[in-house]
Each structure stands twice: as C-alpha cells, then as structure tokens.
UniProtKB/Swiss-Prot annotation:
GO terms for cellular component: host cell nucleus; virion component. Pfam families: Flu_NS2. A motif (Nuclear export signal) lies at residues 12-21, 85-94. Interacts with protein M1. May interact with host nucleoporin RAB/HRB and exportin XPO1/CRM1. Average number present in a viral particle is estimated to be 130-200 molecules. This is Nuclear export protein. It comes from Influenza A virus (strain A/Fowl plague virus/Rostock/8/1934 H7N1). SUPFAM superfamilies: Nonstructural protein ns2, Nep, M1-binding domain (SSF101156). Mediates the nuclear export of encapsidated genomic RNAs (ribonucleoproteins, RNPs). Acts as an adapter between viral RNPs complexes and the nuclear export machinery of the cell. Possesses no intrinsic RNA-binding activity, but includes a C-terminal M1-binding domain. This domain is believed to allow recognition of RNPs bound to the protein M1. Keywords: Host nucleus, Host-virus interaction, Transport, Virion. The lineage of its organism: Viruses, Riboviria, Orthornavirae, Negarnaviricota, Polyploviricotina. GO terms for biological process: exit of virus from host cell nucleus through nuclear pore. Belongs to the influenza viruses NEP family. It is found in: Virion; Host nucleus. Its main location: virion.
C-alpha cells in the first residue's frame, strides 16, 4: 500500500476518534470500524495482487471472494453517503476538513480495490 494512503487512513481514523458528535457518536464509531475494516480488506487484496498467482489460494481460502468484494463496494458506497451527509450537516471546520479528506480517501480506495479486483479476475 502507498505510504501516503497508510498515513491518510491513520490520520483520518485518529481525527474521527477525537470528534464528539453528541448523540451520533455511536454512528461515528460505526464509521471508524468500517474504515478500519476497509483498510484491512484493501491491504489483503493488495497483498494477493503482489503475490500474483495467489488467485487460487484466495479462491480456495474464500470461495465467495466475489461476493465479499461486492459487499465491500456496498460498504464503500454506504460510507461515501454517510460522509457526504456529515459534510452537509456539520458547521465545524475541523470536522468538515476531516470528512472531506475521508471522502477523497474513500474514492481513492474504491478505485484501488477495483484495480486490484480486475487484476485478480
């Protein structure tokens, strides 16, 4: 994974964990969990591509990897919509910047996962 992407994930997760959004803190914790899960999935998919020939072990380890891939894209779309919603309702500039960066990162990661998945197909 690109070192900028790693630091972006870490930076956004750290910023989000410091936010206090009142009654919606439970939703924010859910977003943080989704971000962490997405990062791990993206890393494992990237490692499989790096090993090239690892498609068969990926398929045998998880026969439903295409289903899992589809689920991850649904999670990304959900996160994108959630981040856009937060961006619309927040007036705090720190939160706006954080959510704008999170949105940009999600779009980049979505593209990377698409690229990896095409290489594995």
């Amino acid at each position: 994974m690109d070192s900028n992407t790693v630091s972006s994930f870490q930076d956004i997760l750290m910023r989000m964990s410091k936010m206090q959004l009142g009654s919606s803190s439970e939703d924010l914790n859910g977003m943080i969990t989704q971000f962490e899960s997405l990062k791990l999935y993206r890393d494992s998919l990237g490692e499989a591509v790096m090993r090239m020939g690892d498609l068969h072990s990926l398929q045998s380890r998880n026969g439903k990897w295409r289903e899992q891939l589809s689920q991850k894209f649904e999670e990304i779309r959900w996160l994108i919509e959630e981040v856009r919603h937060r961006l619309k309702i927040t007036e705090n500039s720190f939160e706006q910047i954080t959510f704008m960066q999170a949105l940009q990162l999600l779009l980049e990661v979505e593209q990377e996962i698409r690229t990896f998945s095409f290489q594995l197909i």
